[in-house]
């Protein structure tokens, strides 16, 4: 996998990306938390085949995606081989090592297995290396059907280490218009040719809503990016292969698909969004 120097077009939901050496192929759009089970169906119909579910923290907030996956698979067992389901645990060792991902399997009829094991909220060496070891052993043993492992990073230096040493099949990082520090201490250190993808989370955390914009008393002629423009901001970076997103309702899936068709932002638009977010979320997070 070679990252382009400049992105000419944004990824589409129907595209597929290989997860490391797992043999699994995922859409660049990964669906996470949602209020409506119908959102899962709409995402699948739009080409999304990658889903993100929690195994512990925020369990009630993922009820919509669990029910949506159950509905997607009900009466259509062949669909199970078309989708990739990742389950994240935010527990540290020794609890993490128990790998209680089977609870999600039991909660979603037809799920049968967890394709991707994810260590959540990696913030230190202690929360990373022991969990990587546990996941690698589980992957080697095919525990709960696992074929791939990944992590969500709060400490970017560890994301660099994991990429340079091919420790994971996927990594999730945090980059947005109020949190642009990855430009300085992460993206320059990623190899141009990678064996595993980089996905982003918290892409819209930096949104300046119309109400926030109005309170700034800026000229009416200034651009007010909509929520999907924040995904465009993230995916404009060629180092990022996909995004974890949380559309609450089916129509938001279509809105995202249409937004991605607009293509990448210009450099001026990127800088404008960073500036605008800094006015509301000041000081700008690095």
Predicted features along the sequence, with ranges:
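Short, charged beta->alpha transition segments
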Residues: 69-73, 98-108, 158
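Active-site mouth loops of central-metabolism enzymes
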Residues: 26-38, 86-97, 214-224
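N-terminal binding-site loop/beta-alpha segment at the start of enzyme catalytic domains
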Residues: 1-83
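Beta/alpha (TIM)-barrel catalytic core signal, keyed to glycine-rich beta->alpha loops juxtaposed to Asp/Glu
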Residues: 5-13, 33, 120-286
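Active-site groove signature of glycoside hydrolases
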Residues: 105-127
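Acidic-and-aromatic substrate-binding clefts and catalytic sites of carbohydrate-active enzymes
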Residues: 33-38, 53-65, 90-97, 123-128, ...
């Amino acid at each position: 996998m070679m990252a382009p120097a400049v992105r000419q077009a944004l990824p589409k939901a129907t595209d597929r990306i290989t997860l490391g050496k797992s043999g699994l192929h995922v859409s660049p759009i990964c669906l996470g938390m949602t209020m409506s089970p119908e959102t899962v169906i709409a995402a699948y119909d739009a080409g999304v085949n990658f889903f993100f579910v929690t195994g512990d923290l925020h369990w009630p907030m993922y009820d919509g995606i669990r029910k949506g996956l159950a509905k997607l698979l009900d009466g259509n067992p062949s669909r199970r081989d078309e989708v990739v389901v990742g389950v994240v645990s935010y527990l540290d060792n020794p609890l993490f090592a128990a790998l209680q991902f089977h609870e999600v399997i039991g909660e979603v009829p037809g799920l049968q297995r967890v394709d991707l094991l994810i260590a959540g909220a990696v913030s230190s060496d202690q929360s990373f290396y022991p969990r990587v070891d546990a996941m690698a052993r589980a992957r080697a043993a095919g525990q709960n059907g696992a074929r791939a492992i990944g992590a969500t990073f709060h400490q970017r230096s560890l994301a660099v280490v994991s990429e340079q040493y091919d420790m994971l099949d996927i990594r999730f990082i945090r980059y947005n218009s109020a949190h642009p520090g990855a430009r300085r201490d992460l993206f320059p250190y990623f190899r141009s040719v990678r064996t595993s993808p980089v996905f982003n989370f918290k892409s819209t955390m930096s949104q300046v809503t119309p109400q926030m914009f109005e309170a700034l008393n800026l000229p009416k002629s200034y651009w007010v990016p909509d929520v999907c423009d924040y995904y465009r901001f993230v995916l404009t970076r060629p180092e990022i292969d996909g995004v974890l997103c949380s559309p609450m309702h089916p129509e938001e899936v279509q809105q995202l698909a249409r937004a991605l068709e607009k293509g990448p932002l210009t450099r001026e638009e990127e800088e404008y969004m960073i500036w605008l977010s800094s006015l509301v979320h000041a000081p700008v997070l690095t």
